[in-house]
């Protein structure tokens, strides 16, 4: 469960290392985001020579949460960290690689490029 001021790791090679959530998109007054939701965030840490710089305001999709998500069959998927992938306006990732596993819920929310780049889909 990601809310305003939440910090997330970045799971791609766009150059950002850590994000701070500014806003959760999708509805008036929406407070929290879960796996597959889009957020607006600012870059808090970045690597030198990356595509994005510290202080940039970006859009990102949440790919892993500590709280996890309940599936239709009754099972839960839960991760050790909160992580996101920085995306462009057309929902394609800014980076060319994805690090770590991503949840299957991204496939249902039509982030197919992220799913295809990920090393493992749980």
From Swiss-Prot:
Gene3D superfamilies cross-referenced by the UniProt entry: Ribosomal protein L14
SUPFAM superfamilies per the UniProt record, alphabetical: Ribosomal protein L14
Keywords: Ribonucleoprotein, Ribosomal protein, RNA-binding, rRNA-binding
One cellular component term from this protein's GO annotations in UniProt: cytosolic large ribosomal subunit
Taxonomy, superkingdom: Bacteria
CDD domains on file: Ribosomal_uL14
Alphabetical GO biological process terms: translation
One function term, GO molecular function aspect: large ribosomal subunit rRNA binding
InterPro entries membership: Ribosomal_uL14 (IPR000218), Ribosomal_uL14_bac-type (IPR005745), Ribosomal_uL14_CS (IPR019972), Ribosomal_uL14_sf (IPR036853)
Main function: Binds to 23S rRNA. Forms part of two intersubunit bridges in the 70S ribosome.
Subunit-structure text: Part of the 50S ribosomal subunit. Forms a cluster with proteins L3 and L19. In the 70S ribosome, L14 and L19 interact and together make contacts with the 16S rRNA in bridges B5 and B8.
Family membership: Belongs to the universal ribosomal protein uL14 family.
Protein name as annotated: Large ribosomal subunit protein uL14
Organism classification: Bacteria, Bacillati, Bacillota, Bacilli, Bacillales
Gene name in the database record: rplN
């Amino acid at each position: 469960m990601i809310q305003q001021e939440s910090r997330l790791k970045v799971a791609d090679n766009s150059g950002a290392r850590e994000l701070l959530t500014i806003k959760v998109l999708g509805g008036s007054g929406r407070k929290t985001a879960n796996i597959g939701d889009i957020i607006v965030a600012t870059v808090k840490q970045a690597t030198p020579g990356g595509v994005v710089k510290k202080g940039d305001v970006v859009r990102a999709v949440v790919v892993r949460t500590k709280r996890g998500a309940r599936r239709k069959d009754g099972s839960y998927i839960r991760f050790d960290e909160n992580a996101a992938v920085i995306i462009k306006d057309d929902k394609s990732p800014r980076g060319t690689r994805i690090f770590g596993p991503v949840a299957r819920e991204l496939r249902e929310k039509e982030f197919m490029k992220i799913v295809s780049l990920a090393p493992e889909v749980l």
